[in-house]
Amino acid sequence: MDKSESTSAGRNRRRRPRRGSRSAPSSADANFRVLSQQLSRLNKTLAAGRPTINHPTFVGSERCKPGYTFTSITLKPPKIDRGSYYGKRLLLPDSVTEYDKKLVSRIQIRVNPLPKFDSTVWVTVRKVPASSDLSVAAISAMFADGASPVLVYQYAAFGVQANNKLLYDLSAMRADIGDMRKYAVLVYSKDDALETDELVLHVDIEHQRIPTSRVLPV
């Protein structure tokens, strides 16, 4: 046997264990399939618990989804009498509503008190009929129907209440920027009159990126 034949034979000998070991992955494949099924069930369980417009969740700071950015609206409720209500539709700037077909994935609401705040308020984001005038009676009915999960914000002696944010996931609804006028922030001042300078609401609307101007205005 010459040198080339010896080398070829050596290669074949090295390959045989690899070919012979191919029966082993059948067991590994079965284990992998079981693991995949378990992960699939876990994902379904987690998906069921993800926040929606009807079942929001408390959140900390989160990064935007890839390809998305956010537009913030700041609301300062006027004076609200004890046991009364306030509502404001989500009206985005014209520079954003120009792209009304861009999808909206999430709405986050943050409640920040000003120094004078010493009350309890209920806050929610709710889809409201276009015909609604957001009167006290209309808002009261929406809080009373049980379909409006709320963030209860109370006076915190030091700093800001730990759970001061709610996140609403709209991705399954395929909502877009044009739909945002159908949503409103609703506030209920439960125990005390809320003064004009007591509370600030920050509404962050996460939506698909829109073109931005590269030229400064004149």
Curated annotation (Swiss-Prot):
Localization per Swiss-Prot or TrEMBL: Virion
GO (cellular component) term, any one: T=3 icosahedral viral capsid
Keyword GTP-binding: no
Main localization (coarse): virion
SUPFAM superfamilies reported for this sequence: Positive stranded ssRNA viruses
Keywords, sorted A to Z: Acetylation, Capsid protein, Ribonucleoprotein, RNA-binding, T=3 icosahedral capsid protein, Viral nucleoprotein, Virion
Pfam families linked to this entry: Cucumo_coat
Similarity comment text for this entry: Belongs to the cucumovirus capsid protein family.
Function: Capsid protein. Probably binds RNA and plays a role in packaging.
Protein name: Capsid protein
Organism: Cucumber mosaic virus (strain O)
